[in-house]
């Protein structure tokens, strides 16, 4: 009797599923349309999962906790939208619920999903203009192709993939993948995870308001929320405000935040922060940002020359927005205790065109720390960039459980350019958790310890304002951090003697090998007698 064979099913990884989704659409639509379609499906899948989880939670509360077993009463409570909305969960009908949508026949799937998007856009204020309208009919995928993609997305089961942040892994996979394959401008919306984590860890946005004037897909807000959760804080104590000028990325931000249940205020439309500040009269406790590097053509609005945000500092160059971002961020900070962490190209550290503005920032004591990051951390550029920390309160006092000292007139410089050993995707650099902790340790110790001299060669140095003044108001860390001259450690006489010995040894080996080779040819009859 033949032996019965056991069929072995290979367990699919999350990355395999997500790759299959991308692969199914290869060559079938424009890149941005593929991104929007896939992220919309992920969005519908996960709001459906949160809806089911909330439904189970409500039933458990009524039946198990309150002891009410009247099924009619239970069903009535389950059908009340406010039972879901109070926990940041969207109330879904059969028309918008993933588990119902995926039962649609393949030929009607595109219309069903587009209808679900329009229904959510009409009925959920937070999702107004967040989802791409008619994206499924626009891409015109064959019914079988769309069905295969939907089936792949449906495999992403929270019960199977128990990651702490499964939503984040899925969203970041697509954002990262499309950023890697995009050109520079299309890749601007994605800030590497380890950089965002570093910013959040340094400025500690535990409570109050968090603002990003160029929020991209909302990554800064997501990381801030995760930071709060990791430290046992209350995410509902934080209010998120942002703005984004690119319409497609504006939609991504709304989807990214809504899918996680993060309450947000992103303004009424996608528009430039410079020409139309959507939060004009507000000041914020924390600001996290990754503005487009060296942005040009940002100043084409009527009030540029007289913009009140430049008051006391001078008008920034119209040809490069770096210092316009700095002044905007400073203008939006709470005047008593606001703190900001943001990224700029290294050229902003010593740009001659902005010397007077930089001089005023230093003399007004707004710059707390300058941290140069390693190269190759971004998908869209290989340049090294700088993390700036601005602080409106360097006078000291209690802060998140620590007693800070008075740091008036001081700026901490940190140089991380050599921290480039953690490579992924063959060439990109990512800071490790240990490295992020080390930077925080340097920064926090400097904030709290008595300051006499705070320095470590080739890594950090705390400079007084008068030192910065003496160096022409340059903020380049290498102007302050001590770098050891390795040449002075070399004993040249001994080194030359050793090299001479090595050369003599090589010459002896060469002569011996040559003699053996000549002898071998003689034996073969080719040598001279």
Where are these predicted regions, by residue range?
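Non-catalytic, mostly N-terminal accessory regions of nucleic-acid modification and defense proteins
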Residues: 1-203, 265, 269-278, 372-375, ...
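Conserved Class I SAM-dependent methyltransferase catalytic core
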Residues: 20, 24, 33-46, 199, ...
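Short, contiguous acidic/charged loop-to-helix segments that flank catalytic cores in large enzymes
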Residues: 28, 298-320, 345-352, 374-380, ...
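Active-site catalytic pocket residues across diverse enzymes, especially alpha/beta-hydrolases
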Residues: 51, 228-232, 333
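Hydrophobic alpha-helical scaffolding
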Residues: 139, 160, 214, 242-246, ...
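Conserved S-adenosyl-L-methionine
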Residues: 185-289, 294-312, 324, 344-347, ...
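Short, surface-exposed amphipathic charged segments that create phosphate/polyanion-binding patches used
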Residues: 285, 383-390, 427-433
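Extended hydrophobic-aromatic, low-complexity segments
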Residues: 296-300, 338-341, 351-355, 370-371, ...
């Amino acid at each position: 009797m033949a032996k019965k064979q056991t069929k072995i099913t290979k367990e699919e990884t999350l990355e395999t599923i997500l790759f299959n989704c991308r692969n199914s659409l290869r060559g079938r639509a424009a890149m941005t349309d593929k991104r929007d379609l896939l992220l919309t499906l992920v969005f519908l899948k996960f709001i459906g999962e949160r809806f089911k989880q909330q439904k189970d939670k409500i039933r458990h509360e009524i039946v198990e906790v309150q002891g009410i077993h009247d099924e009619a009463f239970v069903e009535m409570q389950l059908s009340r939208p406010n039972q879901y909305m109070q926990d940041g969960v969207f109330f879904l009908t059969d028309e918008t619920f993933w588990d119902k949508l995926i039962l649609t026949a393949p030929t009607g799937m595109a219309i069903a999903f587009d209808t679900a998007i329009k229904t959510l856009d009409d009925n959920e204020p937070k999702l107004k203009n967040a989802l791409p309208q008619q994206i499924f009919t626009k891409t015109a995928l064959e019914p079988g192709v769309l069905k295969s993609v939907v089936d792949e997305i449906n495999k992403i089961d929270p019960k199977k993939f128990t990651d702490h942040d499964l939503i984040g892994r899925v969203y970041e996979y697509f954002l990262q993948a499309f950023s890697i394959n995009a050109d520079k401008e299309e890749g601007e919306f994605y800030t590497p995870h380890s950089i965002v984590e570093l910013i959040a860890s340094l400025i500690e946005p535990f409570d109050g308001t968090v603002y990003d004037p160029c929020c991209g897909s909302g990554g800064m807000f997501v990381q801030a929320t995760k930071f709060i959760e990791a430290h046992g804080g209350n995410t509902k104590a934080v209010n998120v405000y942002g703005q984004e000028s690119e319409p497609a990325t504006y939609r991504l931000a709304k989807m990214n935040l809504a899918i996680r249940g993060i309450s947000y205020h992103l303004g009424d439309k996608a528009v430039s922060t410079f020409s139309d500040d959507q939060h004009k009269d507000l000041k914020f406790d924390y600001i996290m940002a990754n503005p487009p590097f060296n942005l040009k053509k940002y100043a084409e609005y009527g009030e540029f020359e007289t913009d009140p945000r430049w008051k006391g500092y001078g008008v920034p160059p119209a040809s490069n927005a770096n210092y316009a971002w700095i002044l905007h961020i400073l203008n939006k900070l709470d005047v008593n205790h606001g703190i900001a962490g943001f990224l700029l190209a290294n050229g902003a550290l010593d740009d001659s065109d902005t010397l007077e503005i930089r001089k005023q920032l230093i003399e007004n004591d707004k710059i707390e720390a300058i941290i140069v990051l390693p190269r190759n951390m971004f998908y869209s550029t290989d340049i090294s960039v700088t993390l700036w920390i601005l602080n409106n309160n360097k006078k000291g006092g209690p802060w998140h459980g620590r007693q800070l000292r008075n740091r008036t007139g001081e700026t901490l410089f940190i140089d991380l350019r050599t921290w480039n050993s953690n490579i992924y995707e063959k060439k990109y650099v990512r800071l490790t958790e240990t490295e992020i902790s080390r930077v925080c340790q340097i920064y926090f110790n400097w904030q709290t310890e008595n300051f006499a001299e705070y320095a470590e060669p080739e890594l950090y140095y705390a400079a007084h304002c008068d030192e910065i003044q003496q160096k022409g108001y340059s903020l380049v860390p290498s102007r302050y951090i001590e770098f050891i001259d390795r040449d002075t450690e070399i004993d040249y006489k001994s080194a030359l003697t050793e090299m001479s010995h090595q050369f003599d040894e090589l010459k002896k080996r060469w002569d011996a090998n040559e003699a053996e080779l000549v002898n071998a040819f003689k034996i073969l009859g080719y040598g001279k007698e």
